[in-house]
Swiss-Prot record:
2 of the reaction center chlorophylls (ChlD1 and ChlD2) are entirely coordinated by water. Herbicides such as atrazine, BNT, diuron or ioxynil bind in the Q(B) binding site and block subsequent electron transfer. It is found in: Plastid, Chloroplast thylakoid membrane. The modification N-acetylthreonine is found at residue 2. GO terms for cellular component: chloroplast thylakoid membrane; photosystem II. The lineage of its organism: Eukaryota, Viridiplantae, Streptophyta, Embryophyta, Tracheophyta. Residues 345-353 form a propeptide. It comes from Sorghum bicolor (Sorghum). This is Photosystem II protein D1.
Length: 353
């Protein structure tokens, strides 16, 4: 009898833990995805802060020329970054215990791999946690689907691109100027501005901003008056009220006359689906573009595509971009390359005499 009671107590302890983890009554929902999300994101955040402040220079190119990225080694908030793992490590899994010492681990940029891998696992679990909470509350799953766009984008620049290029040293540095450097080098090597998927991403982000501003201003301009001139318009709404707080018919009429009738949504549900889907699909395409360019399926090349009747090149904007690309390419990692690939001759010129 004693053994049976102990087993029930043990089961009930596990049951209480499960109930607490999956309870929607907690101030912050944890969930089973949260069990993995919390330690991974805490680890990534803690190591990022410490490394951004105090990490020593990293031999990013594997040529014994360390690059400083932390505040204590001369950087500021703008120039500072977590320097990617060394090209000498490549794609190898490089935890602390694989290095001969902590100094070696820091010199080879071990913190970058640690932060990136924990971060990607953490944001993936955050997405799963969004789905899990929606499921518990009986909601539809589209919040997690929308969040998959930034998760895909982060995975593309921090994991897929390094895999395609053969080294974590090609991943995006974790800092402001490091991000810009990554963008410039990416343009030089892959001509991303001429890739259709990047164009769709630009349309998604800029279009999403435009539609968000249009929707917010239109709703704010068609609020149903509930207050006097001396009160804030926000006082006219009470959380949870049943009646609509703005006149969708008036908003529809205004916008239909401003543009044309069928440019204006007359269904609130389809409108909000569109507002969510437009930027999400655009960012999905950008992530796909990065993931294809990771394996060197690059943007369109229209260099020297227009010639006159004598065969002389008439430069287009594509040629101007190409010239800029060449300049950017020869300047990056300048001590690692003797002959940049794009500038190397296809065959050795013959010498007469």
């Amino acid at each position: 009898m004693t053994a049976i009671l102990e087993r029930r107590e043990s089961t009930s302890l596990w049951g209480r833990f499960c109930n607490w983890i999956t309870s929607t009554e907690n101030r912050l929902y944890i969930g089973w995805f949260g069990v993995l999300m919390i330690p991974t994101l805490l680890t990534a955040t803690s190591v990022f802060i410490i490394a951004f402040i105090a990490a020593p220079p990293v031999d990013i190119d594997g040529i014994r020329e360390p690059v400083s990225g932390s505040l204590l080694y001369g950087n500021n908030i703008i120039s500072g970054a977590i320097i990617p793992t060394s090209a000498a490590i490549g794609l190898h899994f490089y935890p602390i215990w694989e290095a001969a010492s902590v100094d070696e681990w820091l010199y080879n940029g071990g913190p970058y791999e640690l932060i990136v891998l924990h971060f990607l696992l953490g944001v993936a679990c955050y997405m799963g946690r969004e789905w899990e909470l929606s499921f518990r509350l009986g909601m539809r799953p589209w919040i997690a689907v929308a969040y998959s766009a930034p998760v895909a984008a982060a995975t593309a620049v921090f994991l897929i691109y390094p895999i395609g290029q053969g080294s974590f040293s090609d991943g995006m540095p974790l800092g402001i100027s490091g991000t810009f450097n990554f963008m410039i080098v990416f343009q030089a090597e892959h001509n991303i501005l001429m890739h259709p998927f990047h164009m769709l991403g630009v349309a998604g982000v800029f279009g999403g901003s435009l539609f968000s501003a249009m929707h917010g201003s239109l709703v704010t301009s068609s609020l149903i008056r509930e207050t006097t001139e001396n009160e804030s318009a926000n006082e006219g709404y009470k959380f949870g009220q049943e009646e609509e707080t703005y006149n969708i018919v008036a908003a529809h009429g205004y916008f239909g006359r401003l543009i044309f009738q069928y440019a204006s949504f007359n269904n609130s549900r389809s409108l909000h689906f569109f507002l969510a889907a437009w930027p999400v699909v655009g960012i999905w395409f950008t992530a796909l573009g990065i993931s294809t360019m990771a394996f060197n399926l690059n943007g369109f090349n229209f260099n020297q595509s227009v010639v006159d009747s004598q065969g002389r090149v008439i430069n287009t904007w594509a040629d101007i971009i190409n010239r800029a690309n060449l300049g950017m390419e020869v300047m990056h990692e300048r001590n690692a390359h003797n002959f940049p690939l794009d500038l190397a001759a296809l065959e050795v010129p013959s010498l007469n005499g």
